[in-house]
Amino acid sequence: MAESNFVDYVKIYCRSGKGGRGSTHMRREKYTPNGGPDGGDGGRGGHVILRGNRNYWTLLHLRYDRHAMAGHGESGSKNRSFGKDGADKIIEVPCGTVVYNAETGEYVCDVTEHGQEVILLKGGRGGLGNWHFKTATRQAPRFAQPGEPMQEMTVILELKLLADVGLVGFPNAGKSTLLSAISAAKPKIADYPFTTLEPNLGIVSYRDGQSFVMADIPGIIEGASEGKGLGLRFLRHIERNSLLLFMIPADSDDIRKDYEVLLNELKTFNPEMLDKQRVLAITKSDMLDQELMDEIEPTLPEGIPHVFISSVSGLGISVLKDILWTELNKESNKIEAIVHRPKDVSRLQQELKDMGEDEELDYEYEDDGDEDDLDYEYEEEDWEDK
């Protein structure tokens, strides 16, 4: 089976650059016998920076580039010349990427907008040259600061797609059929469970050139929170949605029970998802006449808008779009910033294994003869912001 191009979970090793050494150069010129210190400052080490890029919608490009390392700052030189700063390492990521510490599971940052930049690891500051340490009683200091050391961290990048409406339902509930019917998206559709193996996004056109984004994820089954089926690992992609559209087919034995099962799986995954506005669509309703619809209506869950639809015949599609648009534009349904919970450390290694990301990514450092940098006592007042 070919490997999917949709990658929403990768582990990478990141390392910033260390600061360059300050110079200990003493000015020596023919007619300046007591020139004194003129050693320049070392350059700043490169930062590791995450940048949101709307042209990416998957983390596939990072699966084969697991080491992100910035450049080291260069040493200062004579005439108080600054060392060159190390090159920053820019990591382009899709909007909606969340970063966790791969060792502790702690939430680190979130990139949600195109062009947004987040400094993941700061480069070390360059060491001060010896001219900074000249005093009335110390005219010729023959020492300078080493640069600050680099920082390193192995991180998990987890993509959570950005959409307005998320489709929730069992396999074969008609989610992909609806998405293909009301948008230009072309998800795989077939009459067997788990046809959808990865999330799909579609832009739904509304009136007067307005539109909203809909996300379809693999179907959920009862027990998904215990590892059954495919859907649970993809639920992160509807965490950011303003509205959840529950889809249950008209031939269900008990629509209310199926709705409660789906609701419980969401609650198990993230209780905050129950705070989102919900709409219920009874799919495949072209098999029903008005009398059957009237019989089913009293048995439906209370307190949420509902509509009978058929993606094949077009029944109720316009009404559904009206309901979704109205709900999306209610002030009470405006999505708030997500509070990202840290990962459970006790389950983190198993999660990495399940996602195929349990490979060790440690990097072997090059020996550049700066061992004494590690022993230097860095004090904040010694540094100048550069």
Swiss-Prot record:
Binding site for GTP: 169-176, 194-198, 216-219, 283-286, 310-312
GO molecular function: GTP binding; GTPase activity; magnesium ion binding
GO cellular component: cytoplasm
Location relative to the cell: Cytoplasm
Annotated segments matching region Disordered: 18-45, 351-386
Keyword Lipid biosynthesis attached: no
Keywords, comma-separated and alphabetical: Cytoplasm, GTP-binding, Hydrolase, Magnesium, Metal-binding, Nucleotide-binding
Enzyme Commission numbers on file: 3.6.5.-
Cofactors required: Mg(2+)
Function: An essential GTPase which binds GTP, GDP and possibly (p)ppGpp with moderate affinity, with high nucleotide exchange rates and a fairly low GTP hydrolysis rate. Plays a role in control of the cell cycle, stress response, ribosome biogenesis and in those bacteria that undergo differentiation, in morphogenesis control.
Subunit structure as annotated in this protein's UniProt entry: Monomer.
Family, per entry: Belongs to the TRAFAC class OBG-HflX-like GTPase superfamily. OBG GTPase family.
PANTHER family per the UniProt record, alphabetical: DEVELOPMENTALLY REGULATED GTP-BINDING PROTEIN-RELATED, MITOCHONDRIAL RIBOSOME-ASSOCIATED GTPASE 2
NCBIfam families given in the database record: Obg_CgtA, PRK12297.1, PRK12299.1
Protein name: GTPase Obg
